[in-house]
């Protein structure tokens, strides 16, 4: 499991297939803590001005921690997946995954003001 603590500008964490052309989904944190399309997921977290966010990324199945706010499939395009801030300027972590579908499950400590995020990205066989 990869774990890191970051200040998240704009209060949005992006999980995206590298090379995606679908664009980043719009998110309104007051309406929903997470939104996604076939190649990208965004998750609302506390803004960097308020405090840091602890992010854990696992490429294996396991138990949830907190509240699950997203559970769907992401199309990986062959170059892996990036977990980053909204534009990728402040932090960016890349994970090798095979081309094809991967399940993505995101759990947070508080859907309204997440300060801990667990992201599970598991390639489907």
PLM feature spans:
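Extended, solvent-exposed segments with strong compositional bias
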Residues: 64-91
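Primarily secretory-pathway and cell-envelope proteins
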Residues: 1-67, 112-125
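Short, solvent-exposed coil/turn segments at beta-strand boundaries
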Residues: 36-39, 79, 99
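A glycine-anchored, Pro-Gly-centered beta-turn/N-cap motif
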Residues: 98-107
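Short, surface-exposed loop/turn motifs with a glycine/proline- and acidic-biased composition
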Residues: 93-97
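Surface loops and adjacent helix of pleckstrin homology
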Residues: 86, 107-109
